[in-house]
Amino acid sequence: LIVTGCAAQIDPMGFSKMSEVDFVLGNSEKMRPEIWSNLASGAPVESERVQVDDIMSISETASHLIDGFGTRSRAYVQIQNGCDHRCTFCTIPFGRGNSRSVPAGVVVEQIKRLVQKGYNEIVLTGVDLTSWGADLPTHPKLGNLITRILRLVPDLNRLRISSIDSIEVDEEFLDAIATERRLMPHFHLSLQHGDDLILKRMKRRHLREDAILFCEQVRKLRPEVTFGADIIAGFPTESDEHFENSIKLVEECGLTWLHIFPYSKRDGTPAARMPQIDGRIIKSRAELLRSLGKKVRSKHLKEQIGRKHKVLMESSVLGRTEQFAEVLFSSPKQ
């Protein structure tokens, strides 16, 4: 039994104490082909049961050069890993390390290969996607990469962006939203909360007004755009008034897709030392936000009835609109 991933990176000794665990591999070590080759061949792996290096010392990220995804029509391309920010509730930087970007040329070549294999949509992914390029020569921005991909891969039908931090979105990114129809009009925002005091205690870099203005700005550029968001319920010190501001933010930003996280204390984080909210209250608030999420999603979907949409088929009966809404067909499509 081999344990790897962020939990193993953060607490390797905890897993090594489990008698059923044979090896513990860090996030860097799991990318070493020789380890897996030795396991597959039955050859002995290095003597140490725990092989976890200092993730903060890693300065490069290995791009996931995947040539196919079975019968899927959508492919995911990792362009960035790690995070340089230190939100008070989060342990991701200690599991993934500092922000590291895949060079633009490598990204473009991977996308070209996937398009040649018939993939119609590419999704750019990363831990902190909008920080892409900060560690590369000349410090290019994400908007530059988007523009380059769309220019150099003309046969790509759809380019989709995964979760972004709106405060880091650059002008070239905004220009692409306004002018490039192949850039899909759906953006998932890392908002986390709707109250300024809680945002400061989270050590986020934006305020609620920043989020509202960003959504308004993008809607002016691309009226058909939709937004999703991550929101945490029950962060330490969150009062009823603070929570109500998260509820209001859903309407003020016009969000249609909500990803709700009940706050979960992570040992060693600053938030873990703050006054905690009762678990029953956290659960109740998360349920309220999820209920609101279902309501706004249903409203958006009902508004699409009778409208024409371009749909990318994922199977003979299932597809997605450009805004990522799911479409079910009553009979199989070729």
Regions found by a protein language model. Name each.
Residues 6, 33, 124, 161, ...:
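Residue-level signal for inorganic ion chemistry
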Residues 10, 116-240:
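Conserved SAM/AdoMet-binding glycine-rich loop
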Residues 71-73, 183-185, 257, 307, ...:
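A generic structural signal for well-ordered coil/turn residues at beta-strand boundaries
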Residues 273-334:
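Terminal RNA-binding accessory module
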